[in-house]
Amino acid sequence: MLKNNPKYYDAHWMPYSGNREFKANPRMIVSAKDTYFTDDKGRKIFDGLSGLWTCGAGHSRPEIIEAVSKQIETLDYSPAFQFGHEKSFELANKIIEFTPKDLDRVFFTCSGSEAVDSSLKIARAYWRHKGKVGKTRLIGRIKGYHGVNFGGISVGGIGPNREMFGQGIEADHLSSTLLPENIFSKGQPKVGDYLADDLLNKILLHGASNIAAVIVEPMAGSAGVFPPPIGYLKRLRKICDSNDILLIFDEVITAFGRMGAKTGGEAFGVTPDIMTFAKQVSNGSQPLGGVVVKKNIYETFMDTKAPNYLVELFHGYTYSAHPVGCAASIASLDILQNDNLIERVKKMSPIFEKELHSLKGLQYVSDIRNYGLAGGITIESAKNEPALRPYQIAMKCWDKGFYVRYGGDTIQLGLPFIVSEQEIKDVVGAISDSIKELQ
C-alpha cells in the first residue's frame, strides 16, 4: 500500500499518541545517526530526548551494530528456562560493575514495565519465603511512573495511566516531592526531605507487618523531571530499614549515566534493596530490561529444602535474556566505559543547567527543573485546554528541526551523553523561540 494513501496509517494503533492528530499529519523518522534523526523529507532532527531516554551514547553506534550482527548470525535465540547462554552471564557480570556492590544478582526482562512488575513480584515472594505472608501491600508515590503493566500503574501515581483500567493490585502512595517553594531549583531542591515521613503515616495506617516494599524513582522522569529533595531518599531508606520494608529504586531512566553517575542511587548516595533498569542498558538498540537484587534476597529464594531441579521463582518471559539483546547491551555498556561517557555527562550538566534556566522569565514558563542531562519545563495551561501549549511548543520545535517530548504540562529534555555545547544552546534556543511564538 502506498504511503500517500491515508489508509496506510490505519492499521497501526500507536502507543501514547494522539492517533487522530498524527495520522492527519504524520511525522515519520527514517534513520538516525549520532544525535540526529532524519525524517522522510530528508530533514535532520536533533534528538532532544535520546529517543525515549534510551540512546545516550548516540544512534547507530558501529560497536553495537557489529555486536548485534555477529550475535544474530551465531545464536539468534536461546530458551532462558532451564538453559543458558554465554552472553546472559557476561552481561549480568557487566551490569554489576555499574551497580552498588551490595546489588549483585540480575534477573532479565524485556522492558522497563516488565522489570517493575518483576520487582514487585520478587518483593512479595521474598516475604513469603521469610514466613511473613501478610507483607503484600506496595507503596508507590503520587506522580511516580513505573511503566504500564498492572503492577506498574497500581504503584504509579499518574492519573491518566490508571483511571481507564479499573482495579489494579493493592497499593498506596506517598506524597509527591514537587513543592511550590522549590520552583526553579537547580539540581536537588533544598526543601522537602520531611516528605519521606509520609511513609510513617502509611505504616500507621496499614502496619509495617503488611507492607512489602516502597518503590520510587530516584529522580522522577516521565512525570516531568523531579529530582529528589536533599536528604529525602536517605530519610526514606532509614524508615524502610527501621520497619523491615524493602526499598525499590525504579532506575529505568536513571541507570547507566543519565545522572552523571552509574546509577541514580549512586548519584544520591542511597543503595536500595532492589533496582530496576532498561532503556540505556542497550542504548535503545534492542528491548532489554531487568532487576538487580541484593545477594541476601536471592539467597532467600535459594534457601529451600525442595529438590534443586525445582523452580525457585515462578516468573520469567519468553524473551528474557535474549542473546541479541544481551550482545547489544554488553556493547552499549562497553561504550559507556571506554568513551568515559558518564564523566562527560558530569562535564556537560552545568552547561545544560545554565542554558535551560535561561528560559526563566518567559511567558507561560512556571517552573524549570534539572539534574544531570535531564530537564523539565512546566508550561502554564491554557484555559480549558490542558496540555495544548506543551503540544504546540513541541510541534514548533519539530518544525525547526528539534525533537523534544511533551507530557502533561511539561516539556522534557533528556539529552544524549555525546551532546555538544552548541547543540545544547540550539535546542534550548528552539524551545525559547517556540514559546515566544505562542505570545
Language-model features: where?
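Conserved N-terminal phosphate-binding loop of PLP-dependent enzymes in the Aspartate aminotransferase
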Residues: 1-439
